[in-house]
Amino acid sequence: MSMFLDTAKIQVKAGNGGDGMVAFRREKYVPNGGPWGGDGGRGGNVVFVVDEGLRTLMDFRYNRHFKAQSGEKGMTKGMHGRGAEDLIVRVPQGTTVRDAETGKVLTDLVENGQEFIVARGGRGGRGNIRFATPKNPAPEISENGEPGQERELLLELKVLADVGLVGFPSVGKSTLLSVITAAKPKIGAYHFTTIVPNLGMVRTHSGESFAVADLPGLIEGASQGVGLGTQFLRHIERTRVILHVIDMSASEGRDPYEDYLAINKELESYNLRLMERPQIIVANKMDMPDSAENLKIFKEKLAANYDEFAELPQIFPISSLTKQGLATLLDATAELLDKTPEFLLYDESEMEEEAYYGFDEEAPAFEISRDDDATWVLSGDKLEKLFSMTNFDRDEAVMKFARQLRGMGVDEALRDRGAKDGDLVRIGKFEFEFVD
């Protein structure tokens, strides 16, 4: 099980359209009374709505299936069936929605009240009024409702924080958060004390405020899933400014500069765009005996190995214990936030404008295969949609479906594959004989 409650896989099913109706008026001089069957109602959509009051995806652990209502059937007197209400599913602010099958990002839900249709309801089937023609003024034909879209979704929740605290385990991130905000993270002198992100609000002495996330501790190899790994890195993608906290006392026996390089290497390995974010170096534990000398060496190494054309990151010596240097650090952070834009999580070209619910234009209208029992099997989105909307209880509807298959080239394709008169052909669970 994931160490964070920030991912969930769910099933969504939009409502089917209501079936159209076959009905006739009873009027003198009107053939068979004339058609009077109405259309079915639209199936309900499944709609995600951002609720700023939600903080986790915990609810989706216990309720993984969401199904909207179907539209009502068409009625006599040409009346349409009632359309179904949309199913509203509330999600936390900061939820990214992916198609679980393709991994494609469908939407990034960041604004309170933002809505997105994740599954589109099927349209209602047409009643027999719609099929009346001069040649057939009293058609005994109607359509079934279109099936609602069904899909499996992967939800990811990323912490919505302006500033992210990163660094090796036990460098003092949780303590720093506790003294600059009202947050009360778990603090301990052992690695991975923080295994879920802690959030807090900072208010500077000048009245500016911003959100800070103390993110779970990172170790080398995190971008390959080591330790808390990619679960940690997923949470930092949204932050606009990174505070890189380093233990200048070297109390764990590590070189502060090597720590700095290792963390940045992991950030770059996971996603190059993470390194586009401005970074402030927080030299923590400056109240310890060796910290001042270690900071001097750190600055020398940083200057010696930094690109001569690049601007050196700001370094702020602080002590979370004595609160030394905190006010200066927070003012600089607020100033940097003011001039740093938000970073798009994904390229806009990767985002869908709305939920995909039609057919891929490049996909073939149908495919033909053959089972071990020699039955020809027809498949394909377009063909299966036509099949599902055909009312096989009505002879006219069956004949119309046969004409549609011929129009799509199914008969010719079966002949080309070697189908002979009397061979069985299957669509879904429905079988019929091929007539040459």
Curated annotation (Swiss-Prot):
Database matches in InterPro entries: G_OBG, GTP-bd, GTP-bd_Obg/CgtA, GTP-bd_prot_GTP1/OBG_C_sf, GTP1-OBG_CS, GTP1_OBG_dom, GTP1_OBG_dom_sf, OBG_GTPase
Protein name (Swiss-Prot/TrEMBL): GTPase Obg
GO terms under cellular component: cytoplasm
Assigned keywords, A-Z: Cytoplasm, GTP-binding, Hydrolase, Magnesium, Metal-binding, Nucleotide-binding
GO molecular function: GTP binding; GTPase activity; magnesium ion binding
Occurrences of domain OBG-type G (ranges): 161-338
Pfam families: DUF1967, GTP1_OBG, MMR_HSR1
Enzyme Commission identifier(s): 3.6.5.-
GO terms, biological process: ribosome biogenesis
Gene for this chain: obg
Assembly and oligomerization: Monomer.
Main location: cytoplasm
Entry binding sites for Mg(2+): S174, T194
Binding site for GTP: 167-174, 192-196, 214-217, 284-287, 319-321
Family: Belongs to the TRAFAC class OBG-HflX-like GTPase superfamily. OBG GTPase family.
Subcellular location: Cytoplasm
Sequence ranges assigned to domain Obg in this UniProt record: 2-160
